[in-house]
Amino acid sequence: MQKFLIWENNMTQIDSFREEVKQWLDDNCPASMRAGADPETPLDEVWGGRKAVYKNPESKVWLDRMGAKGWTMPTVPSEYGGGGLSKEEVKVLNEEMFAIGAKTPLLSFGIWMLAPVLLEYGSEEQKKEHLPKIIKGEIRWCQGYSEPGSGSDLASLATKAEDIGEHFMVNGQKVWTSYADKADWIFALVRTGPKEPKHDGISFLLIDMETNGVSTKPITLISGKSPFCETFFDDVKVPKSNLIGQLNAGWAIAKALLQHERAFISNFGLAAAVGSKKDLVTIAKKHIGEENGKINNGFYRSEIASHKIKEHAFGLTLQRAGDEGGKASATASMFKLYGTEHNKKRHELMIAAMGTDGVAWDGDEFDDSDKNLTKAWLRTKGNSLEGGTSEVQLNVISKRVLGLPS
């Protein structure tokens, strides 16, 4: 009887919270940030930060309101600017946002990668300094991991940070730094123990991109876009207070962050598939043709059905893992591997359905949407490299999940 009363009380609290969320969203989510918005309204990919430019002013309004509520990171304790919500409350929040088609208010490496390790490894002062700015989208972060010659063998990195009293002097180069030219700060791995074994001489450092000696150079990809950069550090002075964790103990933090990165990549790919206008069925009907609402190709119908079934199963698996909670683990490598290959397969199916339009690049004879799909397909080739290659994920799975020998 007592268990039933506790359950009934919890349900009453959740129901009450749901009504609160519905009312708040109704009052605070701008019309253009919901499903059914005017298709002519400019869309923003909101990353926040000091350099942010908004085509639609309501994108900034939505970010500010969600950030002030702490709902861009709803599980983070309120003393750090988060929402302080329980898992059950977060589930309700997500359901109600989905119900009105609310747009994600903020895309952020700070949220997806840095904040979780700050909560685990950061000092109280570091949490209070950086977490509220991450949650409100005031500061945009980038990741300084890979270097020329240090990709999959990340621990061989050479960027060094020398002790010069109250500061570290940082010299070196990072590469494939996503949006470094647009970021305000970078979280970077640096070598502070040159005489230590390579895994033991690494530290985790936060660096303001406005510091003298920091420079970036965008890298043009096969898609024609330049989301990645080379990042250079030339005699960059960084306060020692920006060291996260202990000196020479950054490798454990680096690995923990990678698990969070892999988890977000797998979730991001699935969200893109579910919420994308580049739907497989729509594209197939456009390019292959349809009859009585069915795609005019039995084999392709079967391929899409199989892909959609796997997509749904993957989504349920991610949801179950999220509901179970716990720290990011090696299972993130399983999700990253599957999510990567699933996203690549989705684009391969779209390109196959498009026929010769699938190689659209320039020229008035091609639709802009077709040209964008071709470039998006090319971009997916990097999915199996970023965040750790698929081969690295297989190694992690074999050792840490299956317990196989090295």
Regions found by a protein language model. Name each.
Residues 37, 289-295, 301, 312-365:
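C-terminal helix-coil-helix/basic helical segment that borders enzyme active sites and/or dimer interfaces
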Residues 214-315, 383, 399:
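Glycine-rich beta->alpha junctions and the first turn(s) of the following alpha-helix
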